[in-house]
């Protein structure tokens, strides 16, 4: 990306209570960055039509018809019948960072990112589903009966932004949200948003245009739709990493278009805003997602109709429950007050994902998006380091940051967070797709309605979940304003590729009523091989999508959501002690929990220093960009401006470091599963944390929790600089899939099956899982070959003793008799061998005698076989390979004194006739290239030389380079044809080295007759041409004769 580009990030909050958060972000940008940063607030009372026009005319060109006419048609919403209540439109925040005014090595490139959320008018929606339209938009918050989104009575009756009733209750609890928004700046004083008004807008009838996509089944959805529009101004990317344009599921990263899509609710696709400093964050960011494939890259926009999209700001709920947060922050405002918490992107590019968090009120601006690859287990792995990032501000800081945005925020730290929930549809497939299809091999095209290429979903049978189970939630998700989530991890049977990459994500915990054991989201793993998942309720719909965009064969981790179990806490007041959701609002209970765990709020603050270390093994896929996988498992996107933005605060803390580990679940193989085996669980009481132990499945129906204590030694930043041991608890919800974990822990960590020995079990689990906050492992083993050769391979016939070693030879019973017998056996064997050798010699002698009687004995045959390679009479010279060469001097001596050898000497001149007539060696015969075959046959093989007489034949041409070697080869070929191999008539054949030219230059006056005529002599050009034509015709004739001989001569009448 070019260094002159700007960067912007735009968020439209669908709740008026987030005005304070917007102002806090603005203040944080202006006070904590060295770059020129501005925030634009669009008042909520602006007309929706005007805002839509602004989207069509601004620099983002979100709905520019010049780039995508179809998308423009699809997103040009008819707003004529929208409710006139303009206060329902959400607040829009645009954060735009200009080029840095200072020079920084980490701020070389910039991006433009723009994200907008807005509610859409009801219109015809055509989700890219592949089942019937009646069941295409399946709601995950429906009743146990399988009802669609339109049929859900809870959705129709409720007037909430999200499909969860908890958000509505949070926004209307004690009217504290309105109070917070009234304390903001004057430009946002009228930005109070009523969620009921938003829902009223969305309840209008469909007046929009029908979708323009071909072969789509239109379906009118009349409630709670939101649009997500993105704009990323960047050139074409390579397919190395991810960027903002491909984050929301667009398939083709090489097409620069403005694109927007609308989707039905059904499942979440979340992302976080990351401001982590990273030097290598602005390289070519691109990968292909499998969420909802369509053309999307670079300058583009994406419109997602979202029912579950909301931004929850805990800071705006100043009720009695939030006062507990302030009290908790008062106890922890000393150590980390100057330390801003920087969130991290963590998301899943599939139809399933987990809720992720980012700070919206007191955090630093969302300037930078991370490029490393987090996963669903990041919440689990990073809980040890990130439990206490929210305990940074006191009550005064909360009031100042919420009500007075003009205050100095140089010491801003984060004590609350927001959650962005972007809804995308989940497809109910009745078929299985390949795990490894790429776009080139049949992937989804942007213009057709085929399902996403690499998807494989298995929908389990839902059953009600046991309400007695205590579900541990993040403390930031208060019971009054949050949604309960259950995360399902990767199953063992589908982990076929490299281990899962896990990236750290800081956990922010506001609620003092939740203990550390309650502050970690639930992570659950389950085997894919279990066909019946009866323990899941309709609120726990599981899907098993596979995403080869992460890596070719690694399926996307399971994700599960729970929408109930928090409704009981939505309308509770200060005395809400219901612990069904682990979100107690009683501060005393939280203190008791902390005391039971041997920690307090001060110790929790001490742990924040452990975030600066990166002790986990470096298993990031950044190191293997040249791997055979299509794209690295890098699911987030980034911008390099964070180093300059946080230049003023990065000197004292290194919050940009990210801990990465590999979680390997292959050791928990499916064959170790046993539904009757026990699992670890955590039983959460009302006033204290639960104990951890081994329980039987009868104690809870097929779902228990695991409480893992990871003990990490951290050094406090306090003045005493004393080292303290912080015990962080991580709660993992497991099913019978992790029954194998119990067996491994029992064998490796020597756990006892006693429920009373809780402390020992916790320590053993800690020693098994912690290892510097990382779980590293090896790749899964390759599958065994099932070929016939492998099956037929047999093990050696060796007797194995009990200790798996060959049995030694027993020599205790040996005696002299046995030794003598062994000696006699050896002599017999030697005699047998000698007799066999003697028989072979006799047979060979008999064969030689028979050959001698036929004048064709073995020795003569061997000699004749060797004669074709070496001469017996003349001294050979190194000439052309495969030919017996002889020098001109040897030929001269032989011709001058024929009596030197007892043989017939013949010199064959292979030149053309005009050359031979011009001059030749004495007594030489002329066999030109044309007609050479017949002449050789007539001259040498019609009456061959007798075997008792030797015949020496010497071939030459002008240079002995072409014509003479050809005649030499022809002569040997004809000799083979007239004899039975290895017998030949003329073993003594030679090739004159240097040809006639060299011989004439040496002995022209003595052994040569005439002169020397060159082949290319100008006086004989006509003769040369005539000879060459004859040679061509002869080659054609010979080719035809060979073809006729090879033909089949069978004729059928």
Swiss-Prot record:
GO terms for cellular component: cytoplasm; nucleus. Keywords: Cell cycle, Cell division, Hydrolase, Mitosis, Phosphoprotein, Protein phosphatase. SMART domains: RHOD. Residues 125-217, 231-253, 273-412, 438-466, 504-532, 562-638, 684-703, 747-829 are annotated as: Disordered. InterPro entries: MPI_Phosphatase, Rhodanese-like_dom, Rhodanese-like_dom_sf. Phosphorylated. Pfam families: Rhodanese. GO terms for molecular function: protein tyrosine phosphatase activity. CDD domains: Cdc25. Residues 296-305, 347-365, 617-638, 785-805 have a biased composition (Polar residues). Transmembrane segments: none annotated. Residues 438-450 have a biased composition (Acidic residues). It comes from the Eukaryota. Its EC number is 3.1.3.48. The active site is at 957 (cysteine persulfide intermediate). Belongs to the MPI phosphatase family. Tyrosine protein phosphatase which may function as a dosage-dependent inducer in mitotic control. This is M-phase inducer phosphatase. The gene is cdc25.
